[in-house]
């Protein structure tokens, strides 16, 4: 996924959402190759350092919709110890949070509230969709439930399950950290390019299928 952020125009129609305009940009790594060795290496090291700090200090927004939220907060207990990943600091304000977990059923009445909370979060920000209800509406194929959070918010990681176990939430957090480590974001609003680059990752289903095929091939060969 490649896009750039543009300043929000308050006079825009509120029906257009999300307000950020997404424009395709090229992979910045190609431009690094064209630079000299010193500047290219310096830029790469600087981005890696910033991404390392971002992915190891992800503060979640204390927000839940249904039973999946119970499983999410269970990961904060001493049994699972999510502080190992630097995400034990729950924030009561979206302005102090780095990512939002949609844990539960997204009802139509909650959509404008969720969108407003998302708009109050500062960049960089990410969204995790946790559970079948948040991913696709789950068993609620009715008029009052939105069939997937990605209908009104950009989602970075999907966590399957009804409800997912705390281990699944931790695994989703690790996938988000992996995605952040490959991102290229502006170092400042006045330094460098303002484009955002996100690497494309295969689904875990494809990765596991590939691993199973490799194991099966090695067993057949032996």
From Swiss-Prot:
**What cofactor does this protein call for?**
[4Fe-4S] cluster
Q: Which GO terms describe its cellular component?
A: plasma membrane; respiratory chain complex I
Q: Protein name, please?
A: NADH-quinone oxidoreductase subunit B
Where along the chain is [4Fe-4S] cluster bound? 67-68, 133, 162
Which PROSITE patterns does this entry report, sorted A to Z? COMPLEX1_20K
Description of how the protein assembles with itself and partners = NDH-1 is composed of 13 different subunits. Subunits NuoB, CD, E, F, and G constitute the peripheral sector of the complex.
> Which Pfam families is this protein grouped with?
Oxidored_q6
> Under the GO molecular function aspect, what terms does this record hold?
4 iron, 4 sulfur cluster binding; iron ion binding; NADH dehydrogenase (ubiquinone) activity; NADH:ubiquinone reductase (non-electrogenic) activity; quinone binding
Give its localization: Cell membrane
Function per UniProt: NDH-1 shuttles electrons from NADH, via FMN and iron-sulfur (Fe-S) centers, to quinones in the respiratory chain. Couples the redox reaction to proton translocation (for every two electrons transferred, four hydrogen ions are translocated across the cytoplasmic membrane), and thus conserves the redox energy in a proton gradient.
Q: Which family does it belong to?
A: Belongs to the complex I 20 kDa subunit family.
Taxonomically, which superkingdom?
Answer: Bacteria
Q: How is the cofactor bound?
A: Binds 1 [4Fe-4S] cluster.
Gene Ontology annotations of biological process type: aerobic respiration; electron transport coupled proton transport
The catalytic activity of this protein is classed by the Enzyme Commission as 7.1.1.-
